[in-house]
Every structure is written in structure tokens, then in C-alpha cells.
């Protein structure tokens, strides 16, 4: 072998090694889908598939202005119980698995608001008690009102 042939063989080996390293790292980042074997998913598709598997499918349509009863799972020691929280939905945010609602109620004369992630495992159930008729997407003006002024008209068509 001449010096020139050694250089070309070494450069070919380096190229093959670099390709093998790139392929091995790509194999680590690419994850196959359970639903379709031997199909590689992009990271975005993988995230969407995971989120779809985590979403609750039994949720009713919830609108701003509705009075809802949310069953919240509470762990106390080794016991678990469901505590109801009832109030008016004053805001809806985000979408998909990140969807949240803000529920407001008056407790002992003080306004209390809680934000619930709809697809969270901590939310056991959501039941719409009453449909509300409103003309706003966010009902933050209810924070400044007191007594009967905080009531929302009932909607009968939904």
C-alpha cells in the first residue's frame, strides 16, 4: 500500500464511522408507534399521538357562562375522595390536552376562582348544571359585581 491509498481508506473509515454515529443517534430519537409497527414518527407526530391518548373523550360541551359542578380528586393520606366545586365558568383557555376553564363561586361572601385543566386526572367529572346566556368570551366583569348582579341569564336552546 502506498501512502495515498492509506489516506483514502482512513477517510472512508471515518466517513462510515460518522454515518454510523449519526444513524445511532437518529435511532435513539426516533420512536416507533404502537399502532403502526416499523413506522417512525416525527417528534411533533409523536407528541400529538401521546396527547390524543391522554385526552378525555367523555366531556360535554362547556361554554363560558355555564354553571358547572366539577368533581375534584383529593388525596388525604392513603384515602382518596371526590370534592364537588360548583360555580360559573368565567373563562376558557387553550385547546386540546391543555384546555382549561376558570370557575368562580362565592364562598362565605368572598369570591373564589379556581382554574381546572379539563383533561387532568385530578378532575373526576364535570357536569353542566345550567347553561348561561352571555355575550362575552371572558366574564371578568363579574369580579366587580356583588349579590344578584353576578347572576347570569339562563339559556334554553343548548
UniProtKB/Swiss-Prot annotation:
Q: Does the keyword Ribonucleoprotein apply?
A: yes
The UniProt entry, under InterPro entries, shows: Ribosomal_bL19 (IPR001857), Ribosomal_bL19_CS (IPR018257), Ribosomal_bL19_sf (IPR038657), Translation_prot_SH3-like_sf (IPR008991)
Where does it sit, as one GO cellular component term?
A: cytosolic large ribosomal subunit
Q: Does the keyword Iron feature in the UniProt annotation?
A: no
Recorded hits in SUPFAM superfamilies, A to Z, give: Translation proteins SH3-like domain (SSF50104)
Q: Where is the composition biased (Polar residues)?
A: 16-35
Q: Which domain of life is it from?
A: Bacteria
Q: Which family does it belong to?
A: Belongs to the bacterial ribosomal protein bL19 family.
Name of the protein described by the UniProt record: Large ribosomal subunit protein bL19
Say which species the protein is native to.
Prochlorococcus marinus (strain MIT 9313)
